[in-house]
Curated annotation (Swiss-Prot):
Belongs to the Psb28 family. It is a peripheral membrane protein. This is Photosystem II reaction center Psb28 protein. The keyword Thylakoid applies. The keyword Thylakoid applies. It is found in: Plastid, Chloroplast thylakoid membrane. The gene is psb28.
Length: 114
C-alpha cells in the first residue's frame, strides 16, 4: 500500500498531479506534487494536527519532504504543492518504486514530455 500523508496517520485521499524532472546524467531530480482541494484543507482538519511535511509511505518505509505550501484563491486555500528533491540515483530508484505503487493504486499513468 502506498499513501501520502501531511499529518502523520491521516491518509490524503485526493490524488496528486505529479511532475518529474531529472538531470541529464540521472543523478538528481525533482518531483512536484499538486493536490487540488485536498482533504487536509477541509473544515475540521485543523483539529487533527499541524502539517509537518509530506510523507510518502509504503511497505519499504517512508520518504519525506518539508517543502509544502498552500495556494490561495480569493483568500481561501485551494491547493497544496509539495516538492520532493531527489539527490542520487539510489533515491531516484526508491522514489520510482513508491510512485509505481501509488500510480497502480490510484489509476495514474505516466506521460513522458516531448
Amino acid at each position: 500500500m502506498a499513501v501520502i500523508q501531511f499529518i502523520k496517520g491521516i491518509n490524503e485521499t485526493v490524488v496528486a498531479d505529479v511532475s518529474l524532472t531529472r538531470s541529464r546524467d540521472g543523478s538528481k531530480g525533482t518531483a512536484t506534487f499538486r493536490f487540488n482541494n485536498p482533504d487536509i484543507l477541509k473544515s475540521g482538519m485543523e483539529d487533527k494536527g499541524d502539517i509537518t511535511g509530506m510523507y510518502l509511505k509504503d511497505d519499504e518505509g517512508e520518504l519525506m519532504t518539508r517543502d509544502v505550501s498552500a495556494k490561495f484563491i480569493n483568500g481561501k486555500p485551494q491547493a497544496v504543492e509539495a516538492i520532493y528533491i531527489i539527490k542520487s540515483p539510489q533515491e531516484w530508484d526508491r522514489f520510482m518504486r513508491f510512485m509505481e505503487k501509488y500510480a497502480n493504486e490510484n489509476k495514474l499513468s505516466f506521460t513522458k514530455a516531448k
